[in-house]
């Protein structure tokens, strides 16, 4: 009887040790960002990350993620990611300036059109203001698309993501089109309002079909406030100098 008790105690000890090792390895994997998320920054334009993670988009929303990178300060490349609540990122992105947008396989001698829109205005369940135009730039050289320096003819100034309260996650979509020799502009009516923009009609007008590349990220309104938010513009200036 005593031997059976000893054997049972030994088995329980081994089981507990195995469980502890398993939990330790799981914790280590999470700390390294595997699986289920990616640390902000990642050694690319951006920065600290401070220990929070960028969750990947749901499977149903990854079809647009095609070889286009979108870098915001602190977070790094957020292509195909969800902006996390940690580090006030959902607040900060509403005040940061335009991101670095890189298309590594752009053609050096070509001109490109960059489009950034929100198809979920005012909400994904009721997108009556689809598409909300956040950024529109034509005549971007292939070299600038490769470097991420978006210069050209600005048809709509960059407007940061500002999803309304209680509307859930919004998709912010980026499309890059090969412009060719097209002279692209907005009509008087289009210039008058950012919301309810007929993107399909605009593309048809200039014979633009499938984008050469595209991506999207998601974010939503965050009600938390912090004094740290006041330092965003200073951080942005440092980011622009990188």
Curated annotation (Swiss-Prot):
UniProt xrefs under InterPro entries: PEBP (IPR008914), PEBP-like_sf (IPR036610), PEBP_euk (IPR035810), Phosphatidylethanolamine-bd_CS (IPR001858)
Major site of localization recorded for this protein: secreted
Chain coiled-coil ranges: none
Region (Important for secretion): 210-242
Subcellular location, record wording: Secreted
Protein keywords: Glycoprotein, Secreted, Signal
Role played: Promotes AKT phosphorylation, suggesting a possible role in the PI3K-AKT signaling pathway.
Name of this protein: Phosphatidylethanolamine-binding protein 4
Organism lineage: Eukaryota, Metazoa, Chordata, Craniata, Vertebrata
């Amino acid at each position: 009887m005593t031997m059976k008790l000893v054997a049972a105690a030994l088995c329980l000890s081994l089981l507990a040790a195995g469980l502890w090792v398993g939990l330790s390895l799981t914790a280590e994997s999470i700390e390294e960002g595997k699986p289920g998320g990616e640390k902000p920054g990642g050694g690319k334009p951006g920065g600290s990350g401070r220990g929070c993670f960028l969750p990947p988009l749901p499977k149903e929303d990854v079809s647009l993620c095609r070889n286009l990178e979108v870098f915001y300060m602190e977070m790094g490349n957020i292509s195909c990611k969800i902006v996390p609540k940690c580090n006030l990122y959902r607040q900060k992105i509403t005040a940061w300036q335009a991101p670095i947008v890189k298309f590594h396989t752009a053609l050096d001698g070509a001109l490109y059109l960059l489009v950034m829109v929100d198809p979920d205005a005012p909400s994904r369940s009721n997108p009556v203001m689809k598409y909300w135009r956040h950024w529109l730039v034509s005549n971007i050289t292939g070299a600038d698309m490769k470097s991420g320096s978006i210069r050209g003819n600005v048809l709509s100034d960059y407007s940061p993501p500002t999803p309304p309260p209680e509307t859930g996650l919004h998709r912010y979509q980026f499309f890059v089109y090969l412009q060719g020799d097209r002279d692209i502009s907005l009509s008087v009516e289009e210039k008058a309002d950012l919301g309810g923009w007929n993107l399909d009609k605009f593309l048809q007008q200039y014979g633009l079909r499938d984008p050469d590349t595209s991506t999207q990220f998601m974010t939503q309104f965050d009600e938390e406030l912090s004094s740290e938010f006041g330092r965003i513009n200073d951080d942005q200036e440092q980011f622009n100098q990188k």
